Amino acid sequence: ADGEGSGSENAVYMETPDNKGIVNFTLEPDGGITYLTPRLANISQSPVTIQVGYDKEALDKYNKDNGASYEPLPPSAFKLADAEGNELSASEGIRVPAGDFSAKIMVKVGQLNSKDFPANKKYAIPLSITGASNYSLIPSQRSAILLLNRSILSSVAKVSGGEGIRIKPVGMHTKAEWTIQMSAIYSSLTRSNLTTAYLSNGTGGEFYTRISSTAGIQVKNGRDGDDTWTQIPLQAGKWLHITYVHKDKKTTVYVNGKVQKVFENSAITFGENSMIVVGNSGYRNDYLREIRLWDKALTESEINDYLYLPMDPATPHLVSYLPLSKEMETKDLKAPAGTENVTT
């Protein structure tokens, strides 16, 4: 706001980071509060009332434009209030005092129970300015989509020994690209030949991985060598969300949504009897959850969109999914007879 204006020459818009219309809203288990700022383009000499309403169409457009799948949080699950905490209705709106150019709207979300709001669903609150006295609206900046980042408490699998978790997918032998994802906490990263995941009985080139605290992650495709490692150090005792994306004879390694390295290698393809094996006998009091296999090469934005929350098993292209949590009714894991037990 850098001037003064009357209704005929003033305009109203919703301020958001970088004016992109998106607000990331982090919720604790018992809920959370964030603020929106409707603004006037110029200072007004008289009070202005700005109406803000629920706008599912704005979320539908966001999902379509971004390939996202956020569901609208119902109006009954949140409240709007002014900066002092007085609850607002859509008809009342928020008041901008004379001589000012903005107001704060408090958005308050209570506890979202897992029965009504499953952890594998992503929610957003779509809000738009619907009117402001006789002022015009800036169409490209009238909406704010609040993307909810929820803190989810979940059980995980604790693993020691065994021969890894083996997944035999159906139909992958016809696919030229794929994505493997896993989430793990390693108690240490100095063990010899500690693998994250590998492909057994593949019909194309070799895919075998190792993980180390100093050299990062190795993608072995027929040979060893320093250049087969990402050379980015990793920490034990922290969640590592690891993603391998293979397409066009390239394998890209991501950790926690960030590219570590792109490896040039041969085509790595599945056979009809191929299995993905996650881990090996090197497990020592490590934690695992969220093992996923996709029959497509996920993009970086898709990887980050799906990174932390449980998935809907019906998600397109998700071929195999092991959430490894009691909440998702995963039972205790036992290794085959004759091998060391894998415990949960």
What are these regions (language model features)?
Residues 290-344:
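Extended recognition patches within non-cytosolic domains
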Residues 1-25, 139-152, 261:
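Bacterial Sec-dependent N-terminal signal peptides
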Residues 149-158, 185-189, 208-265:
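Extracellular glycan-interaction surfaces
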Residues 260-288, 312-319:
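Flexible glycan-contacting loops in extracellular carbohydrate-active proteins
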Residues 29, 167-180, 231-238, 269, ...:
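Extracellular/lumenal carbohydrate-interaction signature centered on repeated Trp-anchored short motifs
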